[in-house]
């Protein structure tokens, strides 16, 4: 439960065009969450995540305004994660994950507890918080990890067409404190799936971590 004060005092108590923390000047049950998780490891190669959520932050986070939605979206928005993963004995270990997983784009989380601020940035609310599809992650070295993915759409509960989208990410831990991340995304996110209308998106993040 949260309370966001807005000194513009909108009559409808809403922060327009926002997907998270959108209800202002009132107590708001923004998010409740319960989940189970099992990580992969060499001694137990299968992993999974399953969780359920509810609250006002679960209402619009998985859609773009005006887009067609998947059937049953009002129920599916309560699914936090739902995936299985496998650590394949390939080289240093290839992790394959299928289902609904955390987004490979963006920096802030849908869940306020994971962020520096209670309200998320405009960029975060216009970047997917979750993805539905399959991804494969491989640690090239102790410093460099690469990932490729195929997903159903930019927003996982939107349904502009029946074509998948594609992308990749690399993470380079340059020093113990300094990390560079880049995600590249390409996909047909309109009704017209011609390549001239594809969404091309690059997400670059430089992270500096100080002392604990």
What is each of the regions a protein language model found here?
Residues 142-145, 168-212:
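Detector for outer-membrane/organellar transmembrane beta-barrel domains
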Residues 59, 156-158, 190-194:
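A generic structural signal for short coil/turn motifs at secondary-structure boundaries
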Residues 160-163, 197:
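Short, solvent-exposed loop/turn segments at conserved positions within beta-propeller repeat blades
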């Amino acid at each position: 439960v949260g309370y966001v004060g807005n000194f513009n005092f909108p009559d409808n108590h809403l922060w327009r065009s926002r997907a998270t923390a959108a209800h202002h000047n009132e107590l708001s049950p923004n998010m409740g969450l319960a989940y189970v998780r099992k990580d992969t490891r060499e001694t137990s190669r299968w992993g999974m995540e399953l969780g359920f959520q509810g609250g006002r932050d679960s209402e619009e986070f998985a859609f773009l305004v005006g887009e067609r939605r998947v059937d049953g979206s009002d129920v599916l928005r309560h699914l936090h994660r739902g995936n299985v993963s496998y650590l394949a004995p390939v080289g240093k270990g290839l992790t394959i994950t299928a289902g609904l997983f955390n987004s490979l784009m963006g920096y802030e989380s849908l869940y306020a507890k994971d962020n520096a601020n209670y309200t998320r940035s405009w960029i975060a609310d216009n970047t997917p918080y979750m993805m539905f599809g399959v991804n494969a992650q491989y640690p090239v070295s102790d410093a460099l990890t690469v990932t490729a993915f195929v997903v159903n759409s930019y927003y996982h509960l939107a349904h502009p067409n029946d074509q998948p989208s594609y992308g990749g990410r690399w993470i380079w831990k340059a020093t113990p404190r300094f990390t560079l991340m880049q995600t590249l995304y390409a996909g047909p996110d309109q009704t017209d799936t011609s390549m001239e209308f594809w969404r091309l998106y690059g997400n670059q993040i430089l992270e500096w971590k100080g002392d604990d």
